[in-house]
Amino acid sequence: MDKPEVTLENYEAVYAYYRDHRQNRLLAKLAYASLYAKYRPRIVYADDAKAQLAGLVKSGRVLIVAANHVTHSDQYTLAATAWNTPLRRAIGRTRVLAKDELFVDPDLHRKVDMMGGIPVFRSKNYGLRAVADAGRLMMDISAERLCRGDNLAIFPEGTCNEDDPTRLQHINSGIGHIAKRAADRGVSPVLLSIGISYGPDAHGPDPENVKSASVFVSEPVFDLPAKPMDIAHVVQKDLQIAVDGAVAAY
């Protein structure tokens, strides 16, 4: 299938393409390795998180990776983190929800595709009603990819936190709907929260120094509630703990 233009008007073709798109795993690993060499995050684990994560990835159990969103470089920090954690084994088998603006420039589009990107049309750009159908289809595709054995990485705040990067913004139910749709199809994903901090002097979405971020990997959450909003509440609490860990370790 030819790669479609990523526009809201074309959302059905967009999600038909990303339902099956899979990047070259070798090239993806090279890209992630280069991002680690550039960004070199300093990774800290909760007590048994590293061993549990290694076992999960080895077993093939699918993960929803939730990370906080404080700069325009977070996706690169997260990719660099994946390279230097047990998540390395999942490179090429992880989808990343990414705002549609990242798919406009052809070169950036290619790079985001290499990272496993799936476009998201955000209500803050188009309005809630305009993106409703596209949003439902995006959640269906995301759940389907989980059911096929892919992991899913999400920045569930939805937009950069420009107020207080130490405190999460409100997390809506979208991540919960994706997890529930996967569970309804027989696959119960495990939540993995990853907190990111660029230090007390980092302000705004484009701080001067985004290298050597402090990254905190929480212990996986195996049992999620049944209702989407309840899942979102669990994510809010668990991800805040990860953010606290990243801030403390900076």
Show where each model-derived region lies.
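Residue-level preference for the first positions of well-ordered beta-strands
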Residues: 62-64, 149-155, 190
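A cross-taxonomic marker for long C-terminal extensions/tails that follow the last structured domain
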Residues: 144, 220, 227-250
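Glycine-rich anion/phosphate-binding loops
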Residues: 130-138
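A cross-family acyltransferase "interaction/gating" segment
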Residues: 109-110, 151, 159-230
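Alpha-helical membrane-targeting segments
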Residues: 18-41, 105-115, 208
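Catalytic core of membrane glycerolipid acyltransferases/transacylases, capturing the structured
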Residues: 17, 57-130
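A short, well-structured juxtamembrane/interface segment
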Residues: 35-62
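Short glycine-rich anion-binding loops that position phosphate/pyrophosphate groups of nucleotides
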Residues: 69-71, 157-160
